[in-house]
Swiss-Prot record:
This is UPF0154 protein PEPE_0872. The keyword Ligase does not apply. It is found in: Cell membrane. It holds the Pfam family UPF0154. It comes from Pediococcus pentosaceus (strain ATCC 25745 / CCUG 21536 / LMG 10740 / 183-1w). It is a single-pass membrane protein.
Length: 73
């Protein structure tokens, strides 16, 4: 086989791998978010009520801010 054909095969294989990897990663992230949804204020409010605390809007906002800052680290 000529060198040009080998180069075309390599380029096509790289493109197929990149497209396949994109769709695999997308499906993985969709499944991950479905199984582990991000925590929102309603979930925090329910969790605090279950622990016997009375959740105020200020306390919920502080906890959400702290969790967002922690996830950025």
């Amino acid at each position: 086989m000529s060198t040009g054909i080998w180069i075309m095969i390599v380029i096509i294989a790289l493109l197929v791998g990149a497209v396949g990897g994109f769709f695999f990663a997308r499906r993985y992230m969709e499944n991950y978010l479905k199984n582990n949804p991000p925590i929102n204020e309603d979930m925090l409010r329910t969790m605090m009520l279950q622990m016997g605390q009375k959740p105020s809007q200020k306390k919920l906002h502080q906890m959400m801010t702290a969790m967002q800052n922690q996830s950025k680290k």
